[in-house]
């Protein structure tokens, strides 16, 4: 189960990174 928890947390981390990159992209245009 720890593997699933890690994957879940990691996907949340990737989502937050993607959101930040998206905001940066919006600001730069």
UniProtKB/Swiss-Prot annotation:
Keywords: Hormone, Phosphoprotein, Secreted. It is found in: Secreted. PANTHER family: GLUCAGON, PRO-GLUCAGON. This is Glucagon. Induction: Produced in the A cells of the islets of Langerhans in response to a drop in blood sugar concentration. GO terms for cellular component: extracellular space. Glucagon plays a key role in glucose metabolism and homeostasis. Regulates blood glucose by increasing gluconeogenesis and decreasing glycolysis. It holds the Pfam family Hormone_2. Its main location: secreted. It comes from Didelphis virginiana (North American opossum). The modification Phosphoserine is found at residue 2. Belongs to the glucagon family. GO terms for biological process: adenylate cyclase-modulating G protein-coupled receptor signaling pathway; negative regulation of apoptotic process; positive regulation of insulin secretion involved in cellular response to glucose stimulus; protein kinase A signaling. The keyword Secreted applies. One of its GO terms (molecular function) is glucagon receptor binding.
């Amino acid at each position: 189960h720890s593997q699933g928890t890690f994957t879940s947390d990691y996907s949340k981390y990737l989502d937050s990174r993607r959101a930040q990159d998206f905001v940066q992209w919006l600001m730069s245009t």
